[in-house]
């Protein structure tokens, strides 16, 4: 950018410097000037009004281009682009001032110099147009699409319970007002859409009430209710089984306890019976020696009496 600015400044300076006619002209030019002095003078010194008329359309074109570019540019342009535009405007002003000064001061210049100045101005404008096109900002903000805020209603204007189809139908409803009312404002469209959606909701609610088709939520609720009933029944059967097993275990334990008690009582009775028999046997053993002694004593008495009787007989 700096190099381009320096080049434009140099071009403006060279155009502003008056060009003096060389005295050492060729012989042919001198001959032509001597033969046709008036024609050469008019050819070398054109009317300044003609120059202004020639430069006016070019200046108008350049000003129109700058105005169009300013209208197209947005406020989100970077500082570098602003600085560049300011520099280009300053250069344009300097070039126009220099061109006017050269027109006023170079009334006696050659037509070739004017042609060179015109060519330099054209090249300057062409360079400006190229630079303006290349410096166009690339990161333009996208146009914001207005989406009206509408209260959502859980009524689906489509097949069954498909949410996607209902959303598509709603999007179609959103697009219809743009086609039917091209001159309407955003507020009118939103109010119209809200009224249409509310009317559609009131129409759809009684239809949905009249329909008795089972939905996914109903089927899910029934399945969950059936599974809960099955779980409750299984829990009840399990509890009944556990109670029965517990009763059986309690009965078995009570029977075992009663059997143990009966066996203990029988063992006690048998022990008592055996002890009684043992005591009776011991008593019998104690009585027998006494009877033997008495028998012996009786036998002794009987034998003694017999002896005494026999002795008396003798």
Swiss-Prot record:
Record-linked SMART domains: OSTEO (SM00017)
UniProt motif Cell attachment site: location: 159-161
Biological processes per GO annotation: androgen catabolic process; biomineral tissue development; cell adhesion; cellular response to testosterone stimulus; decidualization; embryo implantation; negative regulation of collateral sprouting of intact axon in response to injury; osteoblast differentiation
Signal peptide boundaries: 1-16
Localization in the cell: Secreted
Keyword Glycoprotein: yes
Acidic residues biased stretches: 86-96, 104-115
Entry-linked PROSITE patterns: OSTEOPONTIN
Tissues/organs with expression: Detected in cerebrospinal fluid and urine (at protein level). Bone. Found in plasma.
Residues with glycosylation annotation: 134, 138, 143, 147, 152, 234, 308
Modified residues (Phosphothreonine): 66, 185, 190, 237
InterPro entries: Osteopontin (IPR002038), Osteopontin_CS (IPR019841)
Post-translational changes noted in the entry: Forms covalent cross-links mediated by transglutaminase TGM2, between a glutamine and the epsilon-amino group of a lysine residue, forming homopolymers and heteropolymers, increasing its collagen binding properties.
GO CC terms of this entry: cell projection; endoplasmic reticulum lumen; extracellular exosome; extracellular region; extracellular space; Golgi apparatus; perinuclear region of cytoplasm
Single GO term (MF): extracellular matrix binding
Protein name: Osteopontin
């Amino acid at each position: 950018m700096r190099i381009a600015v320096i080049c434009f400044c140099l071009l403006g300076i060279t155009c502003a410097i008056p060009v003096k006619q060389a005295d050492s002209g060729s012989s042919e030019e001198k001959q032509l000037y001597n033969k046709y002095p008036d024609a050469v003078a008019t050819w070398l010194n054109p009317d300044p009004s003609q120059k202004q008329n020639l430069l006016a359309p070019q200046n108008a074109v350049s000003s129109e281009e700058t105005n169009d570019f300013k209208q197209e540019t947005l406020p989100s342009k970077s500082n570098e682009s602003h600085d560049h535009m300011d520099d280009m405007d300053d250069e344009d002003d300097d070039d126009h001032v220099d061109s006017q000064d050269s027109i006023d001061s170079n009334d006696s210049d050659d037509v070739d110099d004017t042609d060179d100045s015109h060519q330099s101005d054209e090249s300057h404008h062409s360079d400006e147009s190229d630079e303006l096109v290349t410096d166009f900002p690339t990161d333009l903000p996208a146009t914001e699409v207005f989406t009206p805020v509408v209260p959502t209603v859980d009524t689906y204007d489509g097949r069954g319970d498909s949410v996607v189809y209902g959303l598509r139908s709603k999007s179609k409803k959103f697009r219809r007002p743009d086609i039917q009312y091209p001159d309407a404002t955003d507020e009118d469209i939103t109010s119209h859409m809200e009224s249409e959606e509310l009317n559609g909701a009131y129409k759809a609610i009684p239809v949905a009430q009249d329909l008795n088709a089972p939905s996914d939520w109903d089927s899910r609720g029934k399945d969950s209710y059936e599974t809960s009933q099955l779980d409750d029944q299984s829990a009840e059967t399990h509890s009944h089984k556990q109670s029965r097993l517990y009763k059986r275990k309690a009965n078995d334990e009570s029977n075992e306890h009663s059997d143990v008690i009966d066996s203990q009582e029988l063992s006690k009775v048998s022990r008592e019976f055996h002890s009684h028999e043992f005591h009776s046997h011991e008593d019998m053993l104690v009585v027998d020696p006494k009877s033997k002694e008495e028998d012996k004593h009786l036998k002794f008495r009987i034998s003694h009496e017999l002896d005494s009787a026999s002795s008396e007989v003798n």
